[in-house]
Amino acid sequence: MNILVTGASGGFGELITKILAKDGHQVFATMRGIGGKNVNAAGQLKSWAQGEKLAVEVIELDVTSQDSVDTAIAKVLADAGHIDVVINNAGIASRGPIESFTVAELHHVFDVNTFGSLRINKAILPGMRERKSGLIIQITSSLGRLVIPMGNAYGASKFAMESFAEALHYQLKPFTIDVAIVEPGSFSTPVMENALVGTESRILSAYNAVSNTKPRMPINPSDPQEIADAVKRLVDMPAGTRPLRTVVGTVFTAGVEELNSASEKTTKDLWDSLGLST
């Protein structure tokens, strides 16, 4: 299959690219700055694929730029003809009290995490709808279901992603297009290590003086390979059998499965009351 992965410069995206390429798929590994910031990551991924004789093409794509998205998708379609699977993985983390971020900083978090995947989906869905076939996998977070005090700028963007993805899951069923959500717990990846911190230092100091809301971070976070393995399993499943949500990891995931089950039941009850079908 022809598979597009965003945020493939490292972390989950790189591992997802490699496991799917090893499985025989044509993978379009996208990242921003392949001639600049991520030139080394792009070069290493290309060299790895060439050495393994696997079908990986590295493509420039900045999910916050509509022109970049349009150019990248056009290139993939010109090379491959169509896209079977999209994995929306590109993301940015943030930490600290919401008040410590400027509105522009909060907008940037949402632009990458939420609107970035919406740009991708709008670009690829016409082709999938025309073929009545396709799979969109949205990498969100357990913090898109749970709230921790100083992670909610990031968490809020993930909550929004969850809502958009679930809506698409139902909306695209008549076109036999699957939408699946992967919810990682705590993992050691460059995204979390490079989390955006609010620049309003005076406000940060005020919160630090009175709050004890910094969570105890896990000593042994889960292995990022678990996310790649979960994505592979979803890709391998027959169309129409994939679960809406898949929780991965053991840290920051307690209760998420139960929350998802309760949400699914509540949604079904609501739809039934409206004479609709999920």
Report each predicted region and the residues it spans.
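Canonical Rossmann dinucleotide-binding motif of NAD(H)/NADP(H)-dependent dehydrogenases/reductases
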Residues: 1-32
